[in-house]
Amino acid sequence: MAPTGQGGQWQEVLCCSICNRHFNETFLPVSLICGHVICRKCAEKPENQTKPCPHDDWKTTHSPSEYPNNVALLSVIFPRKQCMTLSGAVSEAEKRVDQLSIQIAKFFREADSERGGTVSSREISRTLQRKVLALLCYQWREVDGRLKTLKMCRGISERVMIEIILSIQSNTHVSSQLWSAVRARGCQFLGPAMQDDVLRLILMTLETGECIARKNLVMYVVQTLASDYPQVSKTCVGHVVQLLYRASCFNVLKRDGESSLMQLKEEFRTYESLRREHDSQIVQIAFESGLRIGPDQWSALLYADQSHRSHMQSIIDKLQSKNSYQQGVEELRALAGSQTSMLVPAYRYFLTQVIPCLEFFAGIEHEDTSMRMIGDALHQIRILLKLHCSQDDLRKMPKEERRGVILQAEVPGGMGGGPGGSGGAEAGRIGGLHPLYSQIDETGRSISRTNPKDNSHNSPQTPPKQPRQKRYQMGIPPNRMGYSSDAPPFIPSHQQQPPPQFFNSQHLPQRFRGGRQRGAPPPPPPQPMPMLIGYDMPGAPMMQATEVLTADGQMVNGTPQRVVIMQSPTHLPGGPVVMIPQQQMVPPPQSMTPVGGPMGPMGPMTPSIPVQVPPNTMWTATSPTGSVIYPAASPPGQPPHTIWIQSTDGNMFPMFDRGSGGMVWGPGTMLRESGADAEQLLAKRYEILKRLQPSEDDDDPEDGGIGHVSYTVASSVLDDRMDHHPLTMIPVPTIDLPAIPISFANMPTEETMTMIGEMVQNRPRAPSLTAPSSNQPMNVNASASATVQAECGTMSVMDSICQPISTSAIHNSATIPQPVIPMVQVPVQVPIVPAENFNPNVPPPPPPPQGQPMLVDSAIGLLTPIRPILVAHPQNVVSNSLDKIVDVKERISEAQGNASEAENAHLRMELRMAESQMAHLDPYTKNNCLLRALQQVDMELQQLHLNPTVEG
């Protein structure tokens, strides 16, 4: 292997193994056959001519002073210098090898360390770094060095192939397939901790050479572990014993008429040897099942850590057969040529470029150790690493940017190299992957790799992708059903023309999967969207004409409406919610009827006539007498008709008729991208089904008392948390209340306030607040006062509710005689105000006019049963939460074994935040929204010709 003896760190290759000096123009690096590097001064010393390496013994055929300089390591130290001038290459083949080595060394950079002389790379994995450094440190002047170089090239290509396969397959699916294959052979893995305890108990029982029957061994292990693992059973422990039996760890002694005895073999009577054989058997089962699993994932699966990667890598290397490499190449070729695979075209084209490089090393002959073969092998390694790094950068991108790059990837026939033919055919192979790697300089490095903006004139710009939680599944907007996206969203009424037929093929623009025309400029960034929530209002006038309402409540056509803007406390991160009263709709005129006719069999669809809108309006909402379009797919759980609303930026959003509930319109109606793969849909379906299953917490109908009416009333009256209560404005009719009694018109005396305070402190707590009445006395304990007393002695109303509350009379104290003071009804429309001194000279404020909006507390968990609108659009909340949960879990699966503990903790925190978004929804609403989302997911899976019940 490469410099393992240099200070105990294989990365420290920029200093001499003998004198520890850092390489420079004076102390030039010289590679040895074993892979260690010394300086030119030490190589020329007489005592080092016979044994130049202090760590390894090997025979030399040339004097170390005749070895050429390692210009690849010099290029890492001096990246801006022409290091080829320091090369000692003589022939053209040797110069070619040096040039290719310099280009491969560009993947590394000098890093800071305690000793110095360390290199690192941000582009290739740690395992590849070790192999590539070993390749750069071999001495190709010797025959043994050239043989090691060819073997290392084969190892690098094999590692790249494994990483490509691991990047294609899903870690979750691979692990499930692995354990299914293990169970199919009568074996079982119980988890890292439990499996470890079972193996240690088996070893403790049999390490002295005892012969025990299998059933007795299983029963002993079960009884011992029953206290720590209640789920342990004879079946699962017997499967673990079967796994060891399959690995030939026992000597079986058969007896006539009785059960056989098992004796542990001598070579497996230590835990390390037994565990290694146990792990080898599981890896062998994976190989037999055709599964490719990396050492980092093996360490995570079997040990739940990353400290056993070397242990698992040694097992993998030992069990790999000579045909494993060729089998992997055949798998990639079959995947690239399959028409039924779910690979995007850009990735399929990437595989077609990688497979020839892998096939080169599949048929390489190690007997040919000429310099020409070394040059060809390094040339293929350089191409393979660049292709792999480019695709690896694509995988490390955020998912939205990655999809944008994949969608912008050009057709393979139109891909070429850099300008002026720089790089030749090889530049075309590397630059043809996607636009970020479209130019290769004279050193073979991608120009756009470090600064993608420099190549913006040659590659199309990547459009800003919408985040995953913005892709909803609530309908199909018209611009995804064949409508022209370049038409103006609104036109004046005097310029309205008959709707053209956009379903003619010659009028349809060519589109990518994302729905945007090729070469079109990227859409503007999304803005917060308002939402319309309808509610019942008696006595609504007949709407005779099309009415348009803006977000600020201004009237466009018709009569003005009472529009109130409400910021939903749960809508993430949407815009304001707009509520309009339900209207009695007049049947639309004949001219406004859709071309397709009334509801019936779906026929060719035509766009509706746009609505007249002033230029200063941002969002408009129209009644059903305006634009009515019957889409091909209705949202789940909604009537089949939809009223589409178009914004000034061309986006279309549907408004659903909820019958007596008015009209509902929100941003949660955009269609999921058509490129959503089946794996994400299945993952989302699994999340929905998991949340629809009844849990143990559902047994308590009162939810710990939170859903009880007493909690609702008490929380609304007694809760004084004012820092996080969002306010909603709901217009309701004003309630006339009786006048305040004369006795309360004057300021109470100090003696009266003192007696009231003592009475409040001495009275006991009321037993219940469920059904207070005016004739029932209410006793309150001094530990939790029922009123909030200010310094001046007046009470400050901390909250208000939508209906008057009949309060109880305060009972007389047992020690201080005091007449009963009746409590008046608190008016509904008392705003939240701070405590201040009462001034009897100031008249009370006049009552608000009829229909004026009032302030209502809509904090989460308070007054839930009597809130007409607690969540503006619960379907959006559920869709946002599900999409984010699936996205975060997929990122956690991708980061398994590769990310740091801090990144994993951050992902787990994101998952908890995503799962908490639905916590404030009541169970009935949440289940309804989940059922609608499940129906939509099943419909999309059916469109992909997948059976949800089978795939799920």
From Swiss-Prot:
Which organs or tissues contain this protein? Expressed in the intestine.
Q: Which reaction does it catalyse?
A: S-ubiquitinyl-[E2 ubiquitin-conjugating enzyme]-L-cysteine + [acceptor protein]-L-lysine = [E2 ubiquitin-conjugating enzyme]-L-cysteine + N(6)-ubiquitinyl-[acceptor protein]-L-lysine
Q: Cross-referenced PROSITE patterns, in alphabetical order?
A: ZF_RING_1, ZF_RING_2
The coiled-coil segments of this chain are 80-113, 882-922
Write out the GO biological process terms: determination of adult lifespan; nuclear-transcribed mRNA catabolic process, deadenylation-dependent decay; proteasome-mediated ubiquitin-dependent protein catabolic process; protein polyubiquitination; response to heat; ubiquitin-dependent protein catabolic process
Q: Which GO terms describe its molecular function?
A: double-stranded RNA binding; mRNA binding; RNA stem-loop binding; ubiquitin protein ligase activity; ubiquitin-protein transferase activity; zinc ion binding
Which InterPro entries does this entry report, sorted A to Z?
Answer: ROQ_II, Roquin_1_2-like_ROQ, Roquin_domain, Znf_RING, Znf_RING/FYVE/PHD, Znf_RING_CS
Per UniProt, the ranges with Gly residues bias are 413-431
Q: What is the effect of changing R255A?
A: Increases ets-4 mRNA levels compared to the wild-type
Tell me the outcome of changing K254A: Increases ets-4 mRNA levels compared to the wild-type
The pathway it acts in is: Protein degradation; proteasomal ubiquitin-dependent pathway
Substituting Y245A results in: Increases ets-4 mRNA levels compared to the wild-type
- The positions making up the signal sequence are none
Q: What happens when the gene is disrupted?
A: Increased lifespan, retarded growth and development. Increased survival rate upon P.aeruginosa infection. RNAi-mediated knockdown results in increased expression of the transcription factor ets-4 in the nuclei of intestinal cells, which may further result in changes in the expression of genes involved in lipid metabolism.
RING-type Zn finger ranges: 16-57
Segments carrying the region annotation (Disordered) are 410-431, 445-528
Provide a GO CC annotation, any one.
cytoplasmic stress granule
Q: What is its EC number?
A: 2.3.2.27
| UniProt KW keywords | Coiled coil, Metal-binding, Stress response, Transferase, Ubl conjugation pathway, Zinc, Zinc-finger
Q: Where is the composition biased (Low complexity)?
A: 492-512
Identify which top EC class this enzyme belongs to: transferase
Quaternary context = Interacts (via C-terminus) with daf-16.
PANTHER family hit by this protein: RING FINGER AND CCCH-TYPE ZINC FINGER DOMAIN-CONTAINING PROTEIN (PTHR13139), RING-TYPE E3 UBIQUITIN TRANSFERASE (PTHR13139:SF54)
* Job description of the protein: E3 ubiquitin-protein ligase. Regulates the activity of daf-16 and is thereby involved in regulating aging and stress resistance. Regulates nsy-1 activity and thereby attenuates the activation of sek-1 and pmk-1, two components of the p38 pathway, which results in susceptibility to pathogenic bacterial infection. Acts together with rege-1 to repress the expression of the transcription factor ets-4 by binding to the conserved ADE (alternate decay element) and RCE (REGE-1 cleavage element) stem loop structure in its 3'UTR, which probably controls the expression of lipid metabolism genes.
Report the protein name in the record. Regulation of longevity by E3 ubiquitin-protein ligase
The species this protein belongs to is: Caenorhabditis elegans
